[in-house]
Amino acid sequence: MKAQELREKSVEELNTELLNLLREQFNLRMQAASGQLQQTHLSKQVRRNIARVKTLLTEKAGA
């Protein structure tokens, strides 16, 4: 997900996106723990997307 796409979203949409990403991260962690995760790069992508969303929420809160 690109930062520019996220910047166009409202705070409510960003909070929803963050919740979805956290759920996805949990599911990926469970798959990795049980040995079912084939695409290990997805956990890194999700972690970075979470950081992007949190950064934008902080920016919007300060503005």
Swiss-Prot record:
Gene3D superfamilies: 1.10.287.310
Keyword Heme tagged: no
A single GO molecular function term of this UniProt record: structural constituent of ribosome
Membrane found in the keyword field: no
CDD domains for this protein: Ribosomal_L29_HIP
Listed InterPro entries: Ribosomal_protein_uL29, Ribosomal_uL29, Ribosomal_uL29_sf
GO BP annotation list: translation
Gene Ontology cellular component list: cytosolic large ribosomal subunit
Keywords linked to the UniProt accession: Ribonucleoprotein, Ribosomal protein
Coiled-coil regions, chain positions: none
Similarity-based family: Belongs to the universal ribosomal protein uL29 family.
Name the UniProt record assigns to this protein: Large ribosomal subunit protein uL29
